[in-house]
């Protein structure tokens, strides 16, 4: 952008130089008019003083005529130079307007890109929170599985104890009363284990429901992240388009600089011709 602004300043400086040269051309034109008037006065004086020298008077008349023709040519060239300056002013104005529009589009694209990056960062933080929660849920599930395995082991041990009691009931009828008490204790433990098993089963079902819920949320966040990625790609595309527009503007300004240089050379040639014409008039 700094390079573009410098180029625009150079164009404005060239425009001011062209205006100064046009004003100088006007001054040269006025000087030529004064010189022409002076020649006319000298011609009149010579006509009064040298009535007999018609050849010299005719020579001075031709010189005045040539001076008038050169003056007309100088006026035409000065007019053309002024028209070129006006055209250059219009082109510079168009380039400045186009540059302003490109800067606005680029600023908008950069703002949208920044917003998309912020949204992506927020989504990433949300995903990390979900992952942490999922890890905690997995740890809870592992703990519940361990509790379930422990409950199964306890149940198996209870079954083995119950079978052992039954065998002892067959073998030891004399200890029937004691065996019945042990059986009641075992049955009570089995009931407690069954209740614990039911609780563990319910906890597992609750964990499965929570896992399904988190899975649904994860799918939703994935869709949101995908949408944000699409928006980010769109913002990047717009930014690339803005950069291409700026490059195009830079090329346009380079072309204008070439054209300004050509106009300067043209104006220089005009100035040289005008100087030559004034020198010719002065030499007369």
UniProtKB/Swiss-Prot annotation:
Residues 12-40, 51-65 have a biased composition (Basic and acidic residues). Changing residue 117 to K: In DA1A and CMYO23. Its main location: cytoplasm. The modification Phosphotyrosine is found at residue 261. Pfam families: Tropomyosin. The modification Phosphothreonine is found at residues 53, 79, 108, 252, 282. It comes from the Eukaryota. Changing residue 93 to H: In CMYO23; likely pathogenic. Gene3D superfamilies: 1.20.5.170, 1.20.5.340. The modification Phosphoserine is found at residues 61, 87, 158, 206, 215, 271, 283. Phosphorylated on Ser-61 by PIK3CG. Phosphorylation on Ser-61 is required for ADRB2 internalization. Residues 1-65, 117-136 are annotated as: Disordered. One of its GO terms (molecular function) is actin filament binding. The modification N-acetylmethionine is found at residue 1. GO terms for biological process: actin filament organization; muscle contraction; regulation of ATP-dependent activity. One of its GO terms (cellular component) is actin cytoskeleton. It is found in: Cytoplasm, Cytoskeleton. Present in primary breast cancer tissue, absent from normal breast tissue. Keywords: Acetylation, Actin-binding, Coiled coil, Cytoplasm, Cytoskeleton, Disease variant, Muscle protein, Nemaline myopathy, Phosphoprotein. Changing residue 2 to V: In CMYO23; likely pathogenic. Binds to actin filaments in muscle and non-muscle cells. Plays a central role, in association with the troponin complex, in the calcium dependent regulation of vertebrate striated muscle contraction. Smooth muscle contraction is regulated by interaction with caldesmon. In non-muscle cells is implicated in stabilizing cytoskeleton actin filaments. The non-muscle isoform may have a role in agonist-mediated receptor internalization. Homodimer. Heterodimer of an alpha (TPM1, TPM3 or TPM4) and a beta (TPM2) chain. It is linked to Congenital myopathy 23: An autosomal dominant muscular disorder characterized clinically by hypotonia and muscle weakness, and a static or slowly progressive clinical course. Disease onset ranges from birth to childhood. Histologic examination of muscle fibers shows various anomalies including fiber type disproportion, an irregular myofibrillar network, abnormal thread-like or rod-shaped structures, and cap-like structures which are well demarcated and peripherally located under the sarcolemma with abnormal accumulation of sarcomeric proteins. The molecule is in a coiled coil structure that is formed by 2 polypeptide chains. The sequence exhibits a prominent seven-residues periodicity. Belongs to the tropomyosin family. This is Tropomyosin beta chain.
